[in-house]
Design a protein with these regions (language model features):
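Membrane-interface extramembranous regions at the lipid-water interface
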Residues: 1-64, 112-138
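Hydrophobic alpha-helical transmembrane segments in multi-pass membrane proteins
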Residues: 16-36, 59-110
Length: 138
């Protein structure tokens, strides 16, 4: 029985782009964005290493931002709000706001990844890209 049919280069770019753009689903649903690249990964992992790499990268980035960003944001505000009454918390507000902005910056990063992959470029998330490449090589 023949193996899976490889994707065309155009289809590879399209599915990689969709994986990265799925970060925008988080704006509407709050947390369902990582499911899309995970589904794309399992559907196309045997047909395209390019799509597998970008979908797994997008999934892990979104998961890390969702869990890590949510935890850090909650912690930052849990520390800042009580300290505001001691005036020390006023110094914490800029840091809490910066941490709160990180998930929104991740949206921009995901869109940037979508643009890069739609043009056929090899986009890599900082730290995550090399880790995923190692996972797929093993």
């Amino acid at each position: 029985m023949p193996g899976p049919v490889p994707l065309s280069e155009s289809d590879e770019r399209t599915w990689a782009m969709v994986s990265h753009l799925s970060v925008l689903v988080n704006l509407v649903t709050g947390a369902l964005g990582p499911i899309i690249p995970l589904i794309i990964y399992f559907v196309f992992k045997d047909r395209s290493r390019y799509v597998a790499y970008h979908s797994l990268q997008s999934f892990l980035m979104q998961l890390i931002v969702w869990v890590g960003g949510g935890t850090l944001t909650g912690l930052a505000w849990a520390v800042t709000v009580p300290l505001v009454f001691l005036a020390v918390g006023l110094l914490c507000i800029p840091f809490a706001l910066l941490i709160t902005a990180l998930p929104f910056l991740a949206l921009i990063y995901g869109v940037w990844g979508a643009v890069e992959t739609s043009q056929g470029k090899d986009f890599k998330y900082w730290l995550i890209g090399d880790w995923v490449r190692g996972l797929l090589s093993a």
